[in-house]
């Protein structure tokens, strides 16, 4: 079992029950899934760029990403319908907890001038979004073998009803919020 899953059951759940006064442990918010999305606009000009992005995301997530395509043509961006424009991965269960563990303990501290992540990036429904500017903060990516620095978006979907509950949940997972 993943280290953070045990930590959630033994430490986070009792703390949240005490903090918010839930009547049942099933009411306690939990992390449902983590979605990693990498938009690759440069893939229009060069198809190799998409292959590199897919392989980078596969190394980071430990699972093969799905290539996302444009829903409609946009002449200004030189995009046609069904052109590949990015890739995404949805992590659940143990892989999700393993990724969260690596993100909190290894990847985020490797960000240059890191002072914590914003506490304002909640969507109003208990989900958290954050962007990573460079994929090289993850130890799985070898600096010598990358073709370009690419950022990615990380969405943490929780069952929390409010942003306050979601922030408390992530804070108990030792998520490094500013201030």
From Swiss-Prot:
Record keyword RNA-binding present: yes
Any one of the GO BP annotations: translation
Coiled-coil annotated spans: none
Keyword tags: Ribonucleoprotein, Ribosomal protein, RNA-binding, rRNA-binding, tRNA-binding
Signal sequence extent: none
Keyword Calcium on entry: no
GO function term, MF aspect, one: structural constituent of ribosome
GO cellular component: ribonucleoprotein complex; ribosome
InterPro entries from the UniProt entry: Ribosomal_uL5 (IPR002132), Ribosomal_uL5_bac-type (IPR020930), Ribosomal_uL5_C (IPR031309), Ribosomal_uL5_CS (IPR020929), Ribosomal_uL5_dom_sf (IPR022803), Ribosomal_uL5_N (IPR031310)
PROSITE patterns listed in its UniProt record: RIBOSOMAL_L5 (PS00358)
Function according to Swiss-Prot or TrEMBL: This is one of the proteins that bind and probably mediate the attachment of the 5S RNA into the large ribosomal subunit, where it forms part of the central protuberance. In the 70S ribosome it contacts protein S13 of the 30S subunit (bridge B1b), connecting the 2 subunits; this bridge is implicated in subunit movement. Contacts the P site tRNA; the 5S rRNA and some of its associated proteins might help stabilize positioning of ribosome-bound tRNAs.
NCBIfam families hit by this protein: PRK00010.1
Subunit-level organization: Part of the 50S ribosomal subunit; part of the 5S rRNA/L5/L18/L25 subcomplex. Contacts the 5S rRNA and the P site tRNA. Forms a bridge to the 30S subunit in the 70S ribosome.
Family: Belongs to the universal ribosomal protein uL5 family.
The protein, known as: Large ribosomal subunit protein uL5
Species per Swiss-Prot/TrEMBL record: Neisseria meningitidis serogroup A / serotype 4A (strain DSM 15465 / Z2491)
